Curated annotation (Swiss-Prot):
E.C. numbers: 4.1.1.49
Catalytic activity: oxaloacetate + ATP = phosphoenolpyruvate + ADP + CO2
Name of this chain's protein: Phosphoenolpyruvate carboxykinase (ATP)
Keywords linked to the UniProt accession: ATP-binding, Decarboxylase, Gluconeogenesis, Lyase, Nucleotide-binding
Taxonomic classification: Eukaryota, Fungi, Dikarya, Ascomycota, Saccharomycotina
Family: Belongs to the phosphoenolpyruvate carboxykinase (ATP) family.
GO cellular component: cell surface; cytosol
Keyword Lipid biosynthesis attributed: no
Name of the gene this protein is made from: PCK1
InterPro entries named among the record's database cross-references: PEP_carboxykinase_ATP (IPR001272), PEP_carboxykinase_C (IPR013035), PEP_carboxykinase_N (IPR008210), PEPCK_ATP_CS (IPR015994)
Gene3D superfamilies xref list: 3.90.228.20, Phosphoenolpyruvate Carboxykinase, domain 1, Phosphoenolpyruvate Carboxykinase, domain 2
Pathway(s): Carbohydrate biosynthesis; gluconeogenesis
GO biological process: carbon utilization; gluconeogenesis
Residues given in the record as ATP binding sites: 246-253
Length: 544
């Protein structure tokens, strides 16, 4: 591997040619090509078309979602002692890495056109990293142009050598018989080489989430900056910052879109000593069942320059049918964040979060619509990352299933969850942040037994009470077993909804049974982390 020296923007092509052994006569290299040029090239692929709204419709082939079982971290001396090894971060040897990197290079050498995207991850100039993506599909180049932070002309001219490089040869399979491999797909990250190789999957989200994994490593280890899988907004009037954590279907995107607040970002953030900044320059929004009525900002962001992934459209009008999931439930759109009118540009806040919101969609109906958390409870529930996986979100899921994802982003974590949880608790204590657990799921009973989903208007009323400071001053009562502090009243929310013990349609005995069942799942899940948890954190969980 050549050493990383300063290289001017004009010699990027020479560097890529040298690294891959490319012939000038054979391969055209497009660097930071504009959207119109990428559209032109993408449309040469058979299925790719332009939607009636002007977005590029592209298809990722066999893989329409991430392949977490095929993610590998190279086991090497610089990162070995920090990485959280296990099912999330499976190791591969440096030899396997070398084989797969060369396999990717072999494939890229055969392409008539390669695309290079040089851009940034992280809006704070103090912490941002320079990222280079090398790929063979124009759709992938446009996707990463949208998702990374686009450099100015001057920044591009002075870009120099990247801090991290993605080699995307996803159209070409890995050799499943190579050591440490289990399939024809591999997504490998090498923290020593600061590179990533993709083989055997054309799903564009692997690039985005690979860089997220890198930031989950670099920021805490090298800068003592906390990386978070969250959305973030800031009050227009008071400048107060709120972080929203939540798994798919909990309302993270919907609730962070607020007419009284500016959007800093919808998915990936860092919390430093200076404040909060977005990692990305774009949004990767779910499109299933999308409508202008439900999500007007997302709907209107789907226009020229955006990438629609794996959607079904009318062959004559090219109008997209957002309700059609025949290819996948995981239809997506990638667009620059400045396509959202309420976005704050640059996407950072020189202020510390005043409120931390942990969102859950509890289909058991046991958890209250809102409860106030102690710092120890924040650590416990942050590490647990509980929600209910709803029917239809994954193949074979016909009824809601309880699921846990540590730090609300387990597939992307590089370090042990306790490291992130400890940093979060320390920052909350230092900056006197309030923390809340909000259940956007069922009340009155479980989903199966006829409970009702908590109305969005009530959840928004709860958020309004959090943001105006009135909820922090409310009178609270304790909910047994989970020991959650539940407000007795919230303006705009029926009081009978606030305490599920009083609201349970099947009576108190059935409620206690449901509570004990859910608490048991929490306790069982937390056994994975209890060896690194303090007694205070363990005591903050449900007590059976």
């Amino acid at each position: 591997m050549p050493s990383k020296s300063s290289v001017s923007g004009n010699s990027v092509e020479e560097r890529i040619r040298s690294e891959l052994g490319l012939s000038k006569e054979v391969t055209l290299i497009r660097r930071n090509a504009p959207a119109a040029v990428l559209y032109q090239d993408a449309l040469k692929e058979k299925k790719t078309v332009i939607s009636s709204a002007g977005a590029l419709i592209a298809y990722s082939g066999e893989k329409t979602g991430r392949s977490p079982k095929d993610k590998r971290i190279v086991e090497e001396e610089t990162s070995r002692d920090n990485v959280w090894w296990g099912p999330v971060n499976k190791p591969c040897s440096e030899r396997t890495w070398a084989i797969n990197r060369e396999r990717a290079a072999d494939y890229l050498r055969t392409r008539e056109t390669l695309y290079v995207v040089d851009a940034f991850a992280g809006w704070d100039p103090k912490y941002r990293i320079k990222v280079r993506v090398v790929c063979a599909r124009a759709y992938h180049a446009l996707f990463m142009t949208n998702m990374l932070i686009r450099p100015t002309e001057e920044e591009l001219a002075n870009f120099g050598e990247p801090d991290f490089t993605v080699w995307n040869a996803g159209q070409f399979p890995a050799n499943a018989r190579t050591q440490d491999m289990t399939s024809k797909t591999t997504i490998e990250i090498n923290f020593k080489a600061m590179e990533m190789v993709i083989l055997g999957t054309e799903y564009a989200g692997e690039m985005k989430k690979g860089i997220f994994t890198v930031m989950f490593y670099l920021m805490p280890v090298h800068h003592n900056v906390l990386t978070l899988h969250s959305s973030c907004n800031q009050g227009i009037k008071n400048g107060d910052v709120t972080l929203f954590f939540g798994l798919s279907g909990t309302g993270k995107t919907t609730l962070s879109a607020d007419p009284h607040r500016l959007l800093i970002g919808d998915d990936e953030h860092c919390w430093s000593d200076e404040g909060v900044f977005n990692i990305e320059g774009g949004c990767y929004a779910k499109c299933i069942n999308l409508s202008r009525e439900k999500e007007p900002e997302i709907f209107d962001a789907i226009r020229f320059g955006s990438v629609l992934e794996n959607v079904i459209y009318d062959s004559e009008s090219h109008e997209v049918d957002y309700d059609d999931s025949s290819i996948t439930e995981n239809t997506r759109c990638a667009y620059p964040i400045d396509f959202i009118p309420s976005a704050k540009i640059p996407c950072l806040a020189p202020a510390h979060p005043k409120n931390i919101i942990l969102l859950t969609c509890d289909a058991s109906g046991v958890l209250p619509p809102v409860s106030k958390l102690t710092p120890e409870q924040v650590m416990y529930h942050f590490i647990s990352g509980y929600t209910s996986k709803m029917a239809g979100t994954e193949q074979g899921v016909t009824e809601p299933e309880p699921t846990f994802s540590s730090c609300f982003g387990q597939p992307f974590l590089s370090l042990h969850p306790m490291r992130y949880a400890t940093m979060l608790a320390e920052k909350m204590h230092e900056h006197s942040a309030n923390a809340w657990l909000i259940n956007t799921g069922w009340t009155g009973s479980s989903y199966v037994s006829g409970g009702k989903r908590c109305a969005l208007k009530y959840t928004r009323a709860i958020l309004d009470a959090i943001h105006d400071g009135s909820l922090a001053k409310a009178e609270f009562e304790s909910l047994p077993i989970f020991n959650l502090q539940v407000p007795k009243a919230v303006e705009g929310v029926p009081s009978e909804l606030l305490n599920p013990a009083r609201n349970w349609s099947e009576g108190e005995a059935k409620y206690q049974s449901a509570v004990s069942k859910l608490a048991g799942l929490f306790v069982e899940n937390f056994k994975t982390y209890q060896d690194k948890a303090t007694s205070d954190v363990l005591a903050a969980g449900p007590q059976l």
